[in-house]
A protein has these predicted regions:
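Active-site and donor-binding regions of nucleotide-sugar-utilizing enzymes
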Residues: 1-201
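Conserved catalytic-core segment of nucleotide-activated headgroup transferases in glycan assembly
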Residues: 2, 199-279
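Short, charged/polar "capping" segments at the starts of alpha-helices
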Residues: 24-31, 176-179, 235-236, 274-280, ...
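Short acidic-hydrophobic, aromatic-tinged amphipathic segments that line or gate anion-handling sites
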Residues: 36-41, 287-291, 341-352
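Donor nucleotide-activated moiety binding/catalytic core segment of transferases
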Residues: 109, 113-115, 268-314, 318-319
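Structural motif
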Residues: 120-121, 168, 224, 266, ...
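Catalytic binding pocket for nucleotide-activated donors in carbohydrate/polymer assembly enzymes
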Residues: 163-166, 187, 311-369
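Leloir-type glycosyltransferase catalytic cores
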Residues: 203-210, 216, 239, 339-385
Length: 385
Protein backbone atom coordinates (compact mmCIF):
# COMPACT_ATOMS: atom_id res chain seq x y z
CA UNK A 1 0.00 0.00 0.00
CA UNK A 2 2.88 2.40 0.76
CA UNK A 3 5.03 1.27 -2.17
CA UNK A 4 2.96 2.88 -5.00
CA UNK A 5 3.00 6.17 -3.10
CA UNK A 6 6.72 5.96 -2.31
CA UNK A 7 7.52 5.04 -5.91
CA UNK A 8 5.69 8.03 -7.35
CA UNK A 9 7.09 10.40 -4.75
CA UNK A 10 10.64 9.16 -5.34
CA UNK A 11 10.19 9.59 -9.11
CA UNK A 12 9.51 13.30 -8.60
CA UNK A 13 13.07 13.59 -7.23
CA UNK A 14 12.18 16.41 -4.85
CA UNK A 15 12.55 14.51 -1.58
CA UNK A 16 14.62 11.58 -0.34
CA UNK A 17 12.41 8.53 0.22
CA UNK A 18 13.48 5.73 2.57
CA UNK A 19 11.23 2.68 3.03
CA UNK A 20 11.42 0.44 6.09
CA UNK A 21 10.58 -2.94 4.55
CA UNK A 22 10.40 -5.66 7.19
CA UNK A 23 10.59 -9.41 6.49
CA UNK A 24 8.54 -10.32 3.38
CA UNK A 25 7.96 -6.66 2.47
CA UNK A 26 11.64 -6.22 1.66
CA UNK A 27 11.43 -7.95 -1.71
CA UNK A 28 8.50 -5.75 -2.72
CA UNK A 29 10.49 -2.64 -1.86
CA UNK A 30 13.55 -3.92 -3.73
CA UNK A 31 11.43 -4.83 -6.73
CA UNK A 32 10.14 -1.26 -6.88
CA UNK A 33 13.70 0.08 -6.93
CA UNK A 34 13.24 2.00 -3.68
CA UNK A 35 15.83 2.67 -1.00
CA UNK A 36 15.33 -0.13 1.55
CA UNK A 37 15.90 -0.10 5.28
CA UNK A 38 15.60 -3.23 7.43
CA UNK A 39 16.07 -4.08 11.09
CA UNK A 40 19.51 -5.46 10.22
CA UNK A 41 20.56 -1.87 9.47
CA UNK A 42 19.89 -0.89 13.07
CA UNK A 43 21.50 -3.75 14.99
CA UNK A 44 24.04 -2.56 17.54
CA UNK A 45 26.34 -5.50 18.41
CA UNK A 46 27.44 -3.77 21.61
CA UNK A 47 23.94 -3.91 23.14
CA UNK A 48 21.98 -6.45 21.09
CA UNK A 49 23.66 -9.75 22.00
CA UNK A 50 20.70 -10.97 24.05
CA UNK A 51 18.25 -9.82 21.40
CA UNK A 52 20.09 -11.65 18.63
CA UNK A 53 20.22 -14.80 20.75
CA UNK A 54 16.43 -14.63 21.02
CA UNK A 55 16.26 -14.06 17.28
CA UNK A 56 18.34 -17.12 16.45
CA UNK A 57 16.15 -19.23 18.74
CA UNK A 58 12.88 -17.96 17.29
CA UNK A 59 14.09 -18.16 13.69
CA UNK A 60 15.42 -21.71 14.02
CA UNK A 61 12.26 -23.34 12.71
CA UNK A 62 11.49 -20.87 9.94
CA UNK A 63 11.55 -22.17 6.38
CA UNK A 64 10.77 -18.99 4.47
CA UNK A 65 13.24 -18.51 1.63
CA UNK A 66 11.90 -15.02 0.88
CA UNK A 67 13.46 -13.56 4.03
CA UNK A 68 17.17 -13.72 4.83
CA UNK A 69 18.12 -15.43 8.06
CA UNK A 70 19.89 -12.27 9.21
CA UNK A 71 16.73 -10.19 8.81
CA UNK A 72 14.58 -12.82 10.51
CA UNK A 73 17.00 -12.96 13.44
CA UNK A 74 17.12 -9.16 13.70
CA UNK A 75 13.36 -8.66 13.39
CA UNK A 76 12.37 -11.43 15.79
CA UNK A 77 15.20 -10.83 18.23
CA UNK A 78 14.93 -7.06 18.53
CA UNK A 79 11.14 -7.22 18.73
CA UNK A 80 11.19 -9.97 21.35
CA UNK A 81 13.79 -8.15 23.45
CA UNK A 82 11.62 -5.03 23.32
CA UNK A 83 8.67 -7.12 24.52
CA UNK A 84 10.75 -8.47 27.42
CA UNK A 85 11.78 -4.97 28.42
CA UNK A 86 8.16 -3.82 28.47
CA UNK A 87 6.46 -6.73 30.28
CA UNK A 88 9.21 -8.89 31.76
CA UNK A 89 10.70 -12.19 30.62
CA UNK A 90 7.97 -14.47 31.98
CA UNK A 91 5.06 -12.47 30.56
CA UNK A 92 6.88 -12.00 27.24
CA UNK A 93 7.28 -15.75 26.86
CA UNK A 94 3.60 -16.30 27.65
CA UNK A 95 2.43 -13.61 25.22
CA UNK A 96 4.63 -14.86 22.40
CA UNK A 97 3.50 -18.45 22.96
CA UNK A 98 -0.12 -17.33 22.61
CA UNK A 99 0.03 -14.48 20.09
CA UNK A 100 3.28 -14.98 18.20
CA UNK A 101 4.31 -11.81 16.36
CA UNK A 102 1.00 -10.17 17.26
CA UNK A 103 2.52 -9.64 20.72
CA UNK A 104 5.17 -7.28 19.31
CA UNK A 105 5.09 -3.48 19.56
CA UNK A 106 8.80 -2.68 19.13
CA UNK A 107 8.80 0.93 20.25
CA UNK A 108 12.42 0.95 21.43
CA UNK A 109 13.68 -0.29 18.06
CA UNK A 110 11.60 2.16 16.03
CA UNK A 111 12.84 4.95 18.28
CA UNK A 112 16.33 3.84 17.29
CA UNK A 113 15.31 3.99 13.61
CA UNK A 114 13.90 7.51 13.84
CA UNK A 115 16.90 8.74 15.81
CA UNK A 116 19.25 7.51 13.09
CA UNK A 117 17.23 8.38 9.97
CA UNK A 118 15.85 11.73 11.23
CA UNK A 119 12.90 11.89 8.80
CA UNK A 120 10.88 15.06 8.23
CA UNK A 121 7.69 13.04 7.70
CA UNK A 122 6.61 9.49 8.51
CA UNK A 123 4.08 7.70 6.29
CA UNK A 124 2.61 4.51 7.75
CA UNK A 125 -0.35 2.18 7.41
CA UNK A 126 -2.68 1.09 10.20
CA UNK A 127 -0.74 -2.14 10.80
CA UNK A 128 -0.67 -2.94 14.51
CA UNK A 129 2.98 -3.72 15.21
CA UNK A 130 5.98 -1.88 13.80
CA UNK A 131 3.94 0.86 12.14
CA UNK A 132 1.97 1.53 15.29
CA UNK A 133 5.29 1.68 17.12
CA UNK A 134 6.57 4.21 14.57
CA UNK A 135 3.56 6.45 15.19
CA UNK A 136 4.20 6.38 18.94
CA UNK A 137 7.87 7.25 18.46
CA UNK A 138 7.21 9.94 15.86
CA UNK A 139 4.97 11.75 18.32
CA UNK A 140 7.84 11.78 20.84
CA UNK A 141 10.20 13.08 18.15
CA UNK A 142 7.64 15.71 17.02
CA UNK A 143 7.64 14.27 13.48
CA UNK A 144 4.33 14.54 11.57
CA UNK A 145 2.64 11.27 10.60
CA UNK A 146 0.36 10.43 7.67
CA UNK A 147 -1.48 7.12 8.18
CA UNK A 148 -2.93 5.27 5.18
CA UNK A 149 -5.79 3.10 6.44
CA UNK A 150 -6.10 0.05 4.23
CA UNK A 151 -9.62 -1.18 4.97
CA UNK A 152 -12.21 -0.90 7.73
CA UNK A 153 -10.01 -0.32 10.81
CA UNK A 154 -12.57 -2.04 13.04
CA UNK A 155 -9.86 -3.23 15.44
CA UNK A 156 -7.25 -0.54 14.85
CA UNK A 157 -9.65 2.32 15.62
CA UNK A 158 -8.85 1.76 19.30
CA UNK A 159 -5.50 3.46 18.79
CA UNK A 160 -6.09 5.38 15.55
CA UNK A 161 -8.67 7.54 17.34
CA UNK A 162 -6.38 8.28 20.28
CA UNK A 163 -5.06 11.81 20.72
CA UNK A 164 -2.54 12.83 18.07
CA UNK A 165 -1.90 9.31 16.75
CA UNK A 166 -1.48 10.78 13.26
CA UNK A 167 -1.65 14.22 11.68
CA UNK A 168 -3.66 12.91 8.72
CA UNK A 169 -5.53 9.75 7.80
CA UNK A 170 -6.14 8.55 4.23
CA UNK A 171 -9.13 6.20 4.12
CA UNK A 172 -10.91 3.93 1.67
CA UNK A 173 -14.32 5.61 1.49
CA UNK A 174 -16.85 7.87 3.21
CA UNK A 175 -18.10 4.98 5.36
CA UNK A 176 -14.65 4.58 6.92
CA UNK A 177 -14.27 8.33 7.37
CA UNK A 178 -17.57 8.52 9.23
CA UNK A 179 -16.55 5.53 11.37
CA UNK A 180 -13.24 7.12 12.39
CA UNK A 181 -14.80 10.50 13.08
CA UNK A 182 -17.59 8.94 15.15
CA UNK A 183 -14.91 7.03 17.07
CA UNK A 184 -13.07 10.22 17.99
CA UNK A 185 -10.81 11.23 15.09
CA UNK A 186 -10.67 14.91 14.15
CA UNK A 187 -12.78 15.19 10.95
CA UNK A 188 -10.29 17.68 9.53
CA UNK A 189 -7.60 15.00 9.63
CA UNK A 190 -9.52 12.29 7.75
CA UNK A 191 -9.29 12.33 3.94
CA UNK A 192 -11.11 9.99 1.56
CA UNK A 193 -8.44 8.91 -0.93
CA UNK A 194 -9.00 5.23 -1.64
CA UNK A 195 -6.31 2.58 -1.21
CA UNK A 196 -3.20 2.98 -3.43
CA UNK A 197 -2.63 -0.79 -3.35
CA UNK A 198 -5.78 -1.22 -5.43
CA UNK A 199 -4.80 1.14 -8.28
CA UNK A 200 -3.07 -1.65 -10.20
CA UNK A 201 -6.28 -3.69 -10.38
CA UNK A 202 -7.76 -1.62 -13.21
CA UNK A 203 -4.63 -1.30 -15.32
CA UNK A 204 -5.52 -2.37 -18.91
CA UNK A 205 -2.35 -4.47 -19.13
CA UNK A 206 -3.36 -6.30 -15.95
CA UNK A 207 -6.83 -7.03 -17.32
CA UNK A 208 -5.36 -8.33 -20.58
CA UNK A 209 -2.84 -10.45 -18.68
CA UNK A 210 -5.70 -12.11 -16.79
CA UNK A 211 -7.30 -13.20 -20.06
CA UNK A 212 -3.94 -14.40 -21.34
CA UNK A 213 -3.39 -16.41 -18.15
CA UNK A 214 -6.66 -18.29 -18.68
CA UNK A 215 -5.67 -19.00 -22.27
CA UNK A 216 -2.14 -20.14 -21.39
CA UNK A 217 -3.39 -22.52 -18.70
CA UNK A 218 -6.16 -23.82 -20.98
CA UNK A 219 -8.83 -23.00 -18.43
CA UNK A 220 -11.22 -22.12 -21.24
CA UNK A 221 -14.80 -22.52 -20.05
CA UNK A 222 -13.78 -24.05 -16.71
CA UNK A 223 -15.07 -22.39 -13.53
CA UNK A 224 -12.02 -21.20 -11.61
CA UNK A 225 -12.14 -20.77 -7.83
CA UNK A 226 -9.49 -19.02 -5.75
CA UNK A 227 -8.80 -19.76 -2.08
CA UNK A 228 -6.42 -17.18 -0.51
CA UNK A 229 -4.77 -18.93 2.42
CA UNK A 230 -4.84 -17.28 5.83
CA UNK A 231 -3.36 -18.00 9.24
CA UNK A 232 -5.98 -18.08 11.97
CA UNK A 233 -4.71 -17.22 15.48
CA UNK A 234 -5.70 -19.18 18.55
CA UNK A 235 -6.59 -15.93 20.30
CA UNK A 236 -7.68 -12.57 18.88
CA UNK A 237 -4.67 -10.24 19.21
CA UNK A 238 -6.71 -7.32 20.59
CA UNK A 239 -9.88 -8.85 22.02
CA UNK A 240 -10.27 -11.55 24.63
CA UNK A 241 -11.86 -14.34 22.62
CA UNK A 242 -10.61 -17.63 21.26
CA UNK A 243 -10.14 -18.49 17.60
CA UNK A 244 -10.05 -21.77 15.71
CA UNK A 245 -6.67 -22.23 13.99
CA UNK A 246 -8.05 -25.28 12.16
CA UNK A 247 -10.82 -23.34 10.40
CA UNK A 248 -8.85 -22.38 7.26
CA UNK A 249 -7.64 -25.95 6.66
CA UNK A 250 -11.15 -27.33 7.18
CA UNK A 251 -12.58 -24.83 4.72
CA UNK A 252 -9.89 -25.70 2.18
CA UNK A 253 -10.68 -29.40 2.58
CA UNK A 254 -14.31 -28.69 1.65
CA UNK A 255 -13.17 -26.75 -1.40
CA UNK A 256 -10.92 -29.59 -2.49
CA UNK A 257 -13.80 -32.05 -2.09
CA UNK A 258 -16.06 -29.84 -4.20
CA UNK A 259 -13.40 -29.40 -6.88
CA UNK A 260 -12.66 -33.11 -7.17
CA UNK A 261 -16.37 -33.95 -7.36
CA UNK A 262 -16.65 -32.14 -10.71
CA UNK A 263 -14.76 -31.95 -13.97
CA UNK A 264 -15.60 -28.32 -14.73
CA UNK A 265 -13.83 -26.78 -11.72
CA UNK A 266 -10.29 -25.49 -11.20
CA UNK A 267 -9.24 -24.64 -7.64
CA UNK A 268 -6.38 -22.18 -7.22
CA UNK A 269 -4.83 -22.14 -3.75
CA UNK A 270 -2.72 -19.09 -2.93
CA UNK A 271 -0.47 -19.20 0.15
CA UNK A 272 0.33 -15.86 1.76
CA UNK A 273 3.84 -14.47 1.21
CA UNK A 274 6.12 -16.41 3.50
CA UNK A 275 3.52 -19.11 4.17
CA UNK A 276 4.23 -22.74 3.34
CA UNK A 277 1.92 -24.23 0.71
CA UNK A 278 -0.61 -26.70 2.14
CA UNK A 279 -0.40 -30.40 1.29
CA UNK A 280 -2.99 -31.04 -1.42
CA UNK A 281 -3.92 -33.93 -3.72
CA UNK A 282 -1.94 -34.07 -6.94
CA UNK A 283 -4.57 -33.35 -9.56
CA UNK A 284 -4.63 -31.02 -12.60
CA UNK A 285 -7.78 -29.42 -11.19
CA UNK A 286 -5.84 -28.10 -8.17
CA UNK A 287 -3.24 -25.38 -8.78
CA UNK A 288 -0.91 -23.80 -6.23
CA UNK A 289 -0.56 -20.12 -7.12
CA UNK A 290 2.40 -18.91 -5.09
CA UNK A 291 3.85 -15.47 -4.46
CA UNK A 292 5.43 -15.52 -7.93
CA UNK A 293 1.93 -15.27 -9.44
CA UNK A 294 0.77 -11.68 -9.89
CA UNK A 295 -2.32 -11.43 -7.68
CA UNK A 296 -3.99 -8.68 -9.69
CA UNK A 297 -3.63 -10.72 -12.88
CA UNK A 298 -4.88 -13.86 -11.15
CA UNK A 299 -8.00 -12.07 -9.90
CA UNK A 300 -8.87 -11.17 -13.48
CA UNK A 301 -8.51 -14.84 -14.44
CA UNK A 302 -10.73 -16.48 -11.80
CA UNK A 303 -14.51 -16.58 -11.45
CA UNK A 304 -15.13 -16.85 -7.71
CA UNK A 305 -13.00 -16.03 -4.68
CA UNK A 306 -13.85 -18.03 -1.57
CA UNK A 307 -12.20 -16.38 1.40
CA UNK A 308 -12.09 -15.84 5.11
CA UNK A 309 -10.99 -12.45 6.46
CA UNK A 310 -8.46 -11.25 3.86
CA UNK A 311 -7.94 -8.17 1.73
CA UNK A 312 -7.91 -10.42 -1.34
CA UNK A 313 -11.71 -10.49 -1.06
CA UNK A 314 -11.89 -6.71 -1.46
CA UNK A 315 -9.51 -6.77 -4.42
CA UNK A 316 -11.59 -9.49 -6.06
CA UNK A 317 -14.74 -7.41 -5.70
CA UNK A 318 -13.04 -4.39 -7.25
CA UNK A 319 -12.27 -6.34 -10.44
CA UNK A 320 -15.78 -7.80 -10.67
CA UNK A 321 -15.08 -11.29 -9.33
CA UNK A 322 -17.73 -12.85 -7.13
CA UNK A 323 -16.82 -13.27 -3.45
CA UNK A 324 -18.07 -15.81 -0.92
CA UNK A 325 -17.05 -15.16 2.67
CA UNK A 326 -16.44 -18.14 4.95
CA UNK A 327 -17.28 -17.53 8.59
CA UNK A 328 -15.23 -18.84 11.49
CA UNK A 329 -12.43 -16.29 11.85
CA UNK A 330 -11.77 -14.18 14.92
CA UNK A 331 -11.63 -11.29 12.45
CA UNK A 332 -15.15 -11.77 11.06
CA UNK A 333 -16.42 -8.56 12.67
CA UNK A 334 -13.35 -6.67 11.46
CA UNK A 335 -14.17 -7.52 7.84
CA UNK A 336 -17.85 -6.67 7.22
CA UNK A 337 -17.71 -7.89 3.64
CA UNK A 338 -21.43 -8.49 3.18
CA UNK A 339 -22.41 -5.22 4.85
CA UNK A 340 -20.05 -3.36 2.52
CA UNK A 341 -21.44 -5.11 -0.56
CA UNK A 342 -18.16 -6.92 -1.20
CA UNK A 343 -19.22 -10.53 -0.56
CA UNK A 344 -22.59 -11.72 -1.81
CA UNK A 345 -22.98 -14.13 1.09
CA UNK A 346 -21.27 -15.25 4.28
CA UNK A 347 -21.58 -18.89 5.20
CA UNK A 348 -20.26 -21.47 7.67
CA UNK A 349 -17.81 -24.04 6.39
CA UNK A 350 -20.49 -26.72 6.18
CA UNK A 351 -22.38 -24.75 3.51
CA UNK A 352 -19.51 -24.35 1.04
CA UNK A 353 -20.76 -27.05 -1.34
CA UNK A 354 -24.25 -25.58 -1.59
CA UNK A 355 -23.06 -21.97 -1.96
CA UNK A 356 -20.75 -22.91 -4.81
CA UNK A 357 -23.27 -25.16 -6.55
CA UNK A 358 -25.76 -22.31 -6.94
CA UNK A 359 -23.12 -19.77 -8.04
CA UNK A 360 -20.79 -21.66 -10.34
CA UNK A 361 -21.50 -20.57 -13.88
CA UNK A 362 -22.92 -17.16 -13.01
CA UNK A 363 -21.31 -14.24 -14.86
CA UNK A 364 -18.91 -11.87 -13.15
CA UNK A 365 -20.43 -8.84 -11.45
CA UNK A 366 -20.07 -5.24 -12.61
CA UNK A 367 -17.02 -3.85 -10.78
CA UNK A 368 -17.63 -0.73 -8.68
CA UNK A 369 -16.35 2.62 -9.82
CA UNK A 370 -13.21 3.79 -8.07
CA UNK A 371 -10.64 6.42 -8.95
CA UNK A 372 -6.84 6.12 -8.61
CA UNK A 373 -5.82 6.64 -5.00
CA UNK A 374 -2.06 7.20 -5.22
CA UNK A 375 -2.32 10.78 -6.48
CA UNK A 376 -4.89 11.63 -3.80
CA UNK A 377 -2.65 10.28 -1.04
CA UNK A 378 0.28 12.27 -2.43
CA UNK A 379 -1.79 15.44 -2.20
CA UNK A 380 -2.22 14.81 1.52
CA UNK A 381 1.45 13.97 2.04
CA UNK A 382 2.69 17.10 0.26
CA UNK A 383 0.86 19.29 2.76
CA UNK A 384 3.51 18.23 5.28
CA UNK A 385 6.59 18.61 3.06
Amino acid sequence: MVVPVATELAAENTVAVEVLGLTTAANVVRGAGLSLLQFTDFVDPSVDCAALAHGRRLAANLSNGEVTLAESVAYLGLSYRDLEERVGAEQAAALYATLGRHAFLPVSILDRVLTKVKPDLVVITNSPRSERAVAICAKNHKIPVVCIVDLFAADEVKWLASDNYADAFCVLNEFIKEFLVTSGCDPGKVHVTGNPAFDRLRDPDTIAAGSELRRTLAWGDKHVLLWPCVDEPAVHPFENFVGDPSAPSRALLKLVEFCLSRNDIILCVRPRPGQQAPCLPIDPRIVITGADWNLAVLLHAVNIVVAMSTTVAIEAHLVGTRVIKILGSVFDKSMPLVEQGIAECEIPICEIHHALTVRVGLPNIMPPLFLPATSKVLEVIKKFL
